[in-house]
Amino acid sequence: MNGVSRLLSLALLGAALHWAPAQAEEQPRLFELLGQPGYKATWHAMFKGESDVPKWVSDASGPSSPSTSLSLEGQPYVLANSCKPHDCGNNRLLVAFRGDKSAAYGLQVSLPDEPAEVMQTPSKYATYRWYGEPSRQVRELLMKQLESDPNWK
């Protein structure tokens, strides 16, 4: 192996070793959180007293991205999301779990299929449904998460 090949091999090995831990540190997705102790019970409690909860919401059966952790007024929270399978653009769910798993709060966002302008300014056409009786601060947190989407106008 010549010097250039050895250097290239070492660079690739270094990149692979650097990449592996970053992948291992990825935060769990909503469905993975619900498999961890404490989250499932809190999840079900969030829907207590609710009627006509869509199955994709109650089952957390849609696609999701990795969760994030943050602090709100000194209290740790885990934020997660999901969307309706095959209809993510029109149906989303954002969730905030208290860090101690004592409560969960959700925001279901729904958009109509028409008019065509819906996707240009979705906030104008959205309907919101709250789960778990979130405080004003938690509502603001979940709305900020929604508004952080570059496609949300």
From Swiss-Prot:
One Pfam family cited in the UniProt record for this chain: Ivy
GO cellular component: periplasmic space
Leader sequence residues: 1-24
Keyword entries, A-Z: Disulfide bond, Periplasm, Signal
Domain of life: Bacteria
Site note Important for lysozyme inhibition, residues: 86
Localization annotation: Periplasm
Major subcellular location class: periplasm
Entries under InterPro entries matching the protein: Inhibitor_vert_lysozyme_sf (IPR036501), Inhibitor_vertebrate_lysozyme (IPR014453)
Disulfide bond sites: 83-88
Record function comment: Strong inhibitor of lysozyme C.
Family: Belongs to the ivy family.
Subunit structure: Monomer.
Protein name: Inhibitor of vertebrate lysozyme
Organism ancestry: Bacteria, Pseudomonadati, Pseudomonadota, Gammaproteobacteria, Pseudomonadales
